Amino acid sequence: MVTIKEKVFTDVLVIGGGGAACTAAVASARKGADTVLVSKGKIGNSGNTIMIGGSYGMDGESAFYEYHIPEADPSFTKEDLFRSICNDGFNLSDQNMVEQFVEESPRIVYEVREWGREAGQHYKFYRPGNWDVSGRGMGRSLLKGVEKEGSIRLYEDVMIIGLLKNGDRVTGAVGMDLYEGCLLQFEAKEVVLGTGGYQPYSLKNTNSDMTGDGQAMAYRAGARLA
């Protein structure tokens, strides 16, 4: 009979270890919520985030006027970025979400860059308002942000295998410690899935730990997937 080795109680349970999960955990902790962050691998050193690297940015208008980046191009406005994102999505994107992204992402992008600077990572700027950074550099930046917050409880190398429900409400999750083989039960008032995408659609791939856990758990719990 499989038994639960440890029960963890918290206000907010965040599942994942990359960009979405780390920034969600930081935001939760800043609101005063007791926050637990659970990752299948090492936080900031696993998943999609360290694989992609690449470009992170904002509109040039915000970069120049709000964050005082002298090299930025202020002629590339928020409206330009909004249109660019919608066009890239063949105008099928939820435009309310795109608008929210355009308005709120500059603050997050700049703060993550500051975390990276404190962690000794190199971000290369290019116009209109973008930075290039390696995937490893982005991971170290995110880890610095989580560590700076101080109050976030971390559980690494724990694979969440299912969500817990009470009626229609998700109340936590069960995970397996990948090195000890024991089960942990997490009970929370709120649960955030920030587990990234699904990579292994073929036997040979570059990111074998991206197995679609979050999407599968959400679907089994009754969520509608887009």
Please provide the spans of the model-predicted regions.
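N-terminal Rossmann-like FAD-binding beta1-loop-alpha1 element of flavoenzymes
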Residues: 12-37
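Hydrophobic residues within alpha-helices
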Residues: 24, 142, 214-217
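Short hydrophobic core segments
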Residues: 13-15, 185-196
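Active-site nucleophile and cofactor-binding loops and adjacent substrate-binding regions
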Residues: 17, 48-53, 205-210
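Generic start-of-chain signal for non-secretory N-termini
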Residues: 1-11, 19
